[in-house]
């Protein structure tokens, strides 16, 4: 019998990554025995592995997160190459966030949203309430000063949120989640980057066929040619992958 509440770990470049078989497995893992796990979720793709390799602070932030999972198809392929018996599939961060919100709405789990432009955040809240009846106990857009951080953490703690999602981009969101956990430790935190923009239709995601073929990165590159410099960094990751240096 398969244990859906457990998941193997696979090490890439010294970082242990959770190997989920599919979205159902991910949700059963996070809500094992009906209890939502506490800690920090971090989506790992090739670009994030490269940044962690070059930036000790980012590596420490990622390393400290309890739940690191394979978000990028290149990372999934590397796991399968290094561990041929691995039954692991890509769980995209944007999809996991939506599934988590749907589950939270069903179970009445209190949610606090952080990040995004004010209008995008407001639309995100409205859509979450309408679509899944999510119990949003507070929110804060991404426009606040360093001096306002502690007040935000106090608000999150007072809200009793069990899920806190932060859309600020990496590593800003990881830094904020780390610091907020010192004030409000008993929650599941998730860094979600530009997910609110995609969810509300402000940014178009790659069509499903591109996603299924593992070409979402190419779609983004064609849509945003200025990303070419960032994509060139991935040649280094390809060297790791094909030389087995993972």
Swiss-Prot record:
It comes from the Bacteria. Keywords: Glycosyltransferase, Transferase. Pathway: Bacterial outer membrane biogenesis; enterobacterial common antigen biosynthesis. One of its GO terms (molecular function) is lipopolysaccharide N-acetylmannosaminouronosyltransferase activity. One of its GO terms (biological process) is enterobacterial common antigen biosynthetic process. Its EC number is 2.4.1.180. It catalyses: UDP-N-acetyl-alpha-D-mannosaminouronate + N-acetyl-alpha-D-glucosaminyl-di-trans,octa-cis-undecaprenyl diphosphate = beta-D-ManNAcA-(1->4)-alpha-D-GlcNAc-di-trans,octa-cis-undecaprenyl diphosphate + UDP + H(+). The keyword Glycosyltransferase applies. Belongs to the glycosyltransferase 26 family. Catalyzes the synthesis of Und-PP-GlcNAc-ManNAcA (Lipid II), the second lipid-linked intermediate involved in enterobacterial common antigen (ECA) synthesis. NCBIfam families: PRK03692.1 (NF002980), wecG_tagA_cpsF (TIGR00696). This is UDP-N-acetyl-D-mannosaminuronic acid transferase. The gene is wecG.
């Amino acid at each position: 019998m398969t244990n859906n509440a457990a998941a193997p770990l696979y090490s890439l470049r010294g970082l242990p990554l959770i190997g989920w078989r599919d979205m159902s497995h991910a949700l059963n893992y996070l809500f094992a025995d009906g209890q939502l796990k506490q800690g920090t979720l971090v989506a790992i793709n090739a670009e994030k592995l490269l940044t962690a390799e070059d930036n000790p602070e980012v590596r420490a932030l990622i390393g400290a997160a309890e739940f690191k999972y394979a978000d990028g198809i290149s990372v999934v392929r590397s796991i399968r190459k290094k561990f041929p018996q691995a039954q692991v599939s890509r769980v995209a961060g944007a999809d996991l966030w939506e599934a988590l919100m749907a589950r939270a709405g069903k179970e009445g789990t209190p949610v606090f949203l952080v990040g995004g432009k004010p209008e995008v955040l407001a639309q995100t809240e409205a859509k979450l309430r309408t679509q899944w009846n999510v119990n949003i106990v507070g929110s804060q857009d991404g426009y606040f000063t360093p001096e306002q951080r502690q007040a935000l953490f106090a608000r999150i703690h007072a809200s009793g949120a069990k899920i806190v999602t932060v859309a600020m981009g990496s590593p800003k969101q990881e830094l904020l989640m780390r610091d907020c956990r010192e004030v409000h430790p008993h929650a599941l935190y998730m860094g979600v980057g530009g997910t609110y923009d995609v969810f509300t239709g402000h940014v178009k995601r790659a069509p499903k066929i591109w996603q299924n073929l593992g070409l979402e990165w190419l779609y983004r590159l064609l849509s945003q040619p200025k990303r070419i410099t960032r994509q060139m960094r991935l040649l280094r990751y390809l060297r790791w992958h094909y030389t087995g240096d993972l």
